[in-house]
């Protein structure tokens, strides 16, 4: 899977497109009321990416196990300091609605945590290269 995300920022306007292989989807994120910056920070989007990735992976794995899940809430937190500093203290919790046995739910949560792609990308580290 080839994944990409693009952002074109102009005064009071953002064009955002995310793409998986050849499937593109437009997204809306408002700019700040005055200026070029986004109303949502990159740190907030990173944590949303982790929550979304866990959620999608969780539902996929629940379906493989034929588990009925009626809802899931995932909350990620992290600390970010001054410009240039990396984030720290990333933690999360997941709460779900299901009539499945609690031991099976806990097993699925732990399994999903181990195999979640976005989590593992950050846990194992990734190089980022600026190209021209």
Regions found by a protein language model. Give the residues of each.
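Extended beta-strand/beta-hairpin segments
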Residues: 1-48, 56-132
